[in-house]
Curated annotation (Swiss-Prot):
Its EC number is 3.1.13.1. Keywords: Cytoplasm, Exonuclease, Hydrolase, Nuclease, RNA-binding. GO terms for cellular component: cytosol. GO terms for biological process: mRNA catabolic process. This is Exoribonuclease 2. Residues 189-516 form the RNB domain. HAMAP family: RNase_II (MF_01036). One of its GO terms (molecular function) is RNA binding. It catalyses: Exonucleolytic cleavage in the 3'- to 5'-direction to yield nucleoside 5'-phosphates. PANTHER family: EXORIBONUCLEASE 2, RIBONUCLEASE. Residues 561-643 form the S1 motif domain. It comes from the Bacteria.
């Protein structure tokens, strides 16, 4: 009788349209209930029974109920699931399997089975890649997943690496393929094998990209020749190896090992500028004045070189600082180090006055045992030899940026536009409260940005610098020449690491076209997107493996009185994040560890400060002593507390 009643349908429609609804993202808690976060200000309570229909991170539409003045959300429609493809640990065996996603806020096991075509017999503790197949908000009774790939067994010592690479869908090994002979590119190669080129790298480096040679001209100016490994002499555009490199976009450097962009035979041998081996190279010759200015007469050319020495950063630095026992093999090499040192000092001086110089931060190196255990974490400060190479590379990349811009009008450029124009007024207002007066328009120019950065660098602490970081835009990869505000340069195009960066290989091909006077097509925009995405994934992978290894390394310090110096890097409502100065580990200090009485405590992300009873007690960039309260291995998180 009621089945096709149009009035009833209309009434239903009316009720539906009158019921309040909200769209937002589900936030789970460890207590079973959750919240629907609509925006920064508004959230609705989701009771535990309703949480069974959703997962942390799902974007949903929910019906809003009001009972006794309390609002709650009932999930109704799934807009975007949080989990699609994920990694996790398998529970159970054979016919009754489930998988717990490897995520700090996802604790529930999801029933699953091996997907068709997956041969592995899964058992308790195995790590796997899974894909969600069912969701309660899609009309299914429950969540369900397919196991699409076996990663490794529970006790594999290398779980951090294999699980992380699988999570981000990144390659586990070097690409296959060989390059048997050099291509005929129609390039005249200058024979520079007699010159004293040297490479300076870490002692363990095998993929040497760059060799340097300096000489003093009769008028006292210095001439620098930067010779760069030449993989495009072996790899044709559009070939199988080229396409594999294009997908990888970068060599992936993880703690303990790397996954190269090119086959190891090329990256570590045929292309690597090994000592006493003749190698093809792409070279740039520039003349540097006493004040560090690079002459306009820049020459790019193809060459053949033979590195005369594989030098290590620490040895060269020790020698220049009159420390240690290491000596250059002969006077020719010693003379090179002295000249390169002079170039470094004059270029550094020029950049201090006319561009910007990053503050030196140490690199942290994990020392690993045979079984992936962390034996030590060593802070490696950036020393004078690192700076020699850095100044030479920045100069060479500046030269490439100019030549590609002037001769072609395009290339693969690293572009950074400083501050987002939408933030300029807020930035000026913030600086004003700290006694720095800037013009909101001027600060958007390269000149104005550099001026502000120099003023910030002259401040007694980095606190103000940390406050304005959120107003900055991100660096981008672009085919269009543009300024790099972060470096304080009018344009910047890298070509000095073609063994490990695909964008540098593209710039090599463009520079070769310039050398030959040939026309060449502008690179496609999609390649810059692929490079940006891969750079993001590689960084996340490096961070994830690092978190795992830090947790392993500090696990035995939990609950002890061992003190660590730690720099405060961020303040949030829930507490503050710190970086341990000696090893680079990131730890979290929950607000209750800062002060027991919550009402007397104000943690302000906006101001980067922690106030107790109205007094600022901690602020971002402060260095404090902490102890490790707890290490949660399942989430790889380190909880610290201020040392008593």
């Amino acid at each position: 009788m009621f089945q096709d009643n149009p009035l009833l349908a209309q009434l239903k429609q009316q009720l539906h349209s009158q019921t309040p609804r909200a769209e937002g993202v589900v936030k789970a808690t460890e207590k079973g209930f959750g919240f629907l976060e609509v925006d920064a200000q508004k959230s609705y309570f989701i009771p535990p029974p309703q949480m069974k229909k959703v997962m942390h991170g799902d974007r949903i539409v929910a019906v809003i109920h009001t009972e006794k003045e309390r609002e709650s959300a009932e999930p109704e429609e799934l807009i975007e699931p949080f989990l699609t493809r994920f990694v996790g640990k398998v529970q159970g065996k054979n016919d009754r399997l489930s998988i717990v996603p490897d995520h700090p806020l996802l604790k529930d096991a999801i029933p699953c089975r091996a997907a068709r075509g997956v041969q592995h017999e899964f058992k308790e503790g195995d790590w796997a890649v899974a894909e969600m197949r069912r969701h309660p908000l899609k009309g299914d009774r429950s969540f369900y997943a397919d196991l699409t790939q076996y990663i490794t067994f529970a006790d594999d010592h290398f779980v951090p690496w294999w699980v992380t690479l699988a999570r981000h869908n990144l390659e586990k090994e070097a690409p296959n393929g060989v390059a048997t002979e050099m291509l005929d590119e129609g390039l005249e190669r200058q024979d520079l094998t007699a010159l004293n080129f040297v490479t300076i790298d870490s002692a363990s480096t095998e993929d040497m990209d760059d060799a340097l040679y300096a000489e003093e001209l009769a008028d006292g100016r210095l001439q620098l020749t930067v010779a760069i490994a030449d993989p495009t002499a072996w790899i044709a555009e559009g070939s199988k190896l080229d396409n594999a490199a294009k997908i990888r976009a970068f060599t992936n450097y993880l703690p303990g090992f790397n996954i190269p962009m090119l086959p190891r035979e090329l990256s570590d041998d045929l292309c690597s500028l090994r000592a006493n081996e003749v190698r093809p190279a792409l070279a740039c010759r520039m003349i540097i004045a006493a004040d560090g200015t690079i002459d306009d007469d820049i020459a790019f050319f193809a060459a053949t070189i033979e590195s005369k020495a594989k030098l290590a950063y620490d040895n060269v630095s020790d020698w220049l600082e009159n420390n240690g026992t290491w000596q250059p093999d002969n006077e020719g090499i010693a003379q090179q180090i002295r000249l390169l040192h002079r170039i470094c000092l004059s270029r550094s001086e020029w950049r201090h006055h006319h561009a910007l110089v990053f503050k030196d931060r140490p690199d942290y190196r994990f020392v690993l045992g045979e079984k992936g255990e962390v034996l030590d974490i060593v802070a490696e400060p950036r020393r004078i030899a690192n700076r020699i190479v850095e100044e030479s590379m920045i100069a060479a990349n500046l030269c490439a940026a100019r030549v590609l811009r002037d001769k072609l009008g395009f290339g693969i450029y690293n572009v950074h536009t400083g501050f987002d124009p939408a933030n300029a007024d807020a930035l000026a207002a913030l600086l004003k409260t700290h006694g720095l007066h800037v013009d909101a328009e001027e600060v958007l120019t390269l000149e104005g940005f550099c001026k502000l950065r120099r003023e910030l660098d002259a401040q007694p602490s980095g606190f103000l610098d940390s406050r304005i970081r959120r107003f900055q835009s991100f660096a981008e990869i672009s085919t269009e020449p543009g300024p790099h505000f972060g470096l304080g340069l009018e344009a910047y195009a890298t070509w000095t690491s073609p063994i490990r960066k695909y964008g540098d290989m593209i710039n090599h091909r463009l520079l070769k076209a310039v050398i030959k006077g040939e026309a060449i097509a502008r690179p496609q925009e999609d390649i810059t997107q692929q490079m940006a995405e891969r750079r993001r994934l590689n960084r996340m992978a490096e961070r994830d493996v690092g978190d795992w290894l830090y947790a392993r390394f500090l696990n035995d310090k939990a609950g002890t009185n061992t003190r660590f110096a730690a720099e405060i890097i961020d303040v949030s409502r829930g507490g503050m994040r710190v970086r341990l100065v000696d090893n680079g580990a990131i730890a979290f200090i929950p607000a209750p560890f800062l002060h027991a009485v919550r009402d007397e405590l104000v943690c302000s992300q906006e101001n980067g400060t922690v106030q107790i009873k109205g007094e600022t007690v901690y602020k971002v960039t402060d260095v404090i002593d902490v102890t490790i309260a707890e290490v949660r291995m399942e989430t790889r998180s380190i909880i610290a507390r201020p040392a008593a």
